[in-house]
């Protein structure tokens, strides 16, 4: 099965977050935001990708909103009331309470002050919020019989949540915005190790590693103090809830310690009261310190911060003002900035990220922190198409953003342990850099699609099993007899891969074959130390196909490096691959295009992708035998090859080889070439290790074909089998079930 992901917004961009995820036959919309830097139709996601005829309710099974910031929820009334979506909408209770306030605030600015007409009304906001179903953290919600969702704490702002969505055995985690670092009023994001097929994560600060938070706080307070001491005014653009509470706690405490009560601090009228109310209502969403002190003292009852009245903008003397919105794209913060910017005594501190197109972004890209002289140079900044102002005030960007930095993003990936990662809500170049880091350091597939680009993820599952080695050998023999009407031990070795080409057109497509890898691979330096110049045999995956039937079946790309092998097999780095044998089975149930594929059977998988029509059994062996000297190895190899030519003497000679190996107790680390009989004799000496099934569901037992790949390994502590299931052959399913049931 597959999972499809297409961003309608926030694909290689920050703003109008909206991601459509298809799991099975279910379509989920994660977030429905607007772009704060756009003033035309581009401010909303392009919903025509979902349905050309507007049948959104039939297509979308549910909408999930992660938090109340407008770039994540701002288009929701437009989608429900103007586009006609009438299905379920999920968000946390704090998000449901705060969303309509911010939506109405923005609507007033857009419609009543700017005069725009194609916008939702106040009644539409109310009607939209009536459709919302609130969810609690860690509560599993059944959207329908197939789709379930679960919310996890995201930090970032009050009520922010990451969401885990599951359909059958396929799952996705969508993070929204999150913060892995606790602050003065919120905790850090946290999620179970849910091992989703896909993790969709924000990457606002994909290449940033933040410095000490305490150092940033000192810098913030120092700059404000220096400005107001000289009689200047400080403007701090913020959003109504979230970061501003953090900064208010900080500055209110500092004002008290420094006896600066004669210099007023203001907060946009009405917002302080509303913020206080919501933090009282949803105190359980704050951090432990806030909860513990709330009974004695409400930390949001600020002593030195007062409501701001519009006439105070022209008042003489020093002051500090927190004004909304945070990106200087409209509202009180922009109006005050126009008034204060031409005065070189004043200062504007931008504490967070500003999207492209906003005045805040223009200031950060042209003037931030370059004007730190006592007499800053002026610059001309375009406010809109009709207005340009001269900016003489100091501009500083001190990041107090509640987004995860690069370290936090990697931390969340490790915490959730996904199979694939998709990056959204970030800048393209930075996402590309982080993507390569994730692929290289974590070995996880990573994508960062643009808006409108669909990513398709193959979600075939694996079942790790520990199983008896003796039992495994018997079952392989049983399998070969059951499906090929012949015993495994009766097949001859192939000393030249060209023989496979010669047999392509014969009726051997369903036969089981032994392949002598020693005579059919080139040599590479594996696990090479500076003091070891000896070549070691490499094991390759070879495939025959109708498109490629030339004699040169083995190519450089087929080789697996030692490090990749050890990573795949989860082995210690000291493990050295040695030479062995493989067995192939060509399955009748494969499609015609794959009928000539060479299936490999052996000791451990090599790094080559499986198609969705295959089941993979992956296992490693603990041989624990002593190596011979180089001369003895050659003798053993010759004996083994002779044994292969004379099946009647196979077991005796191999047992002799086995005894010779056991009696030879030296520390030579040269590789040994082993045939299949010798390996199976070694297996028979090992005791069963039992079984430990991590996940096993009846729906998995519908496989089409069995593919077992191999690499001979020298030192492995235990055996791991991974079975990848598909859906068809009931006989093979029954056979595998019987194997599992027979293990004690």
From Swiss-Prot:
Its EC number is 3.1.27.-. CDD domains: INTS11-like_MBL-fold. One of its GO terms (cellular component) is cytoplasm. Keywords: Cytoplasm, Hydrolase, Metal-binding, Nucleus, Zinc. Its cofactor is Zn(2+). One of its GO terms (biological process) is snRNA processing. The keyword Nucleotide-binding does not apply. Its main location: nucleus. InterPro entries: Beta_Casp, INTS11-like_MBL-fold, MBL, Metallo-B-lactamas, RibonucZ/Hydroxyglut_hydro, RMMBL. PANTHER family: CLEAVAGE AND POLYADENYLATION SPECIFICITY FACTOR FAMILY MEMBER, INTEGRATOR COMPLEX SUBUNIT 11. Component of the Integrator complex. The core complex associates with protein phosphatase 2A subunits, to form the Integrator-PP2A (INTAC) complex. This is Integrator complex subunit 11 homolog.
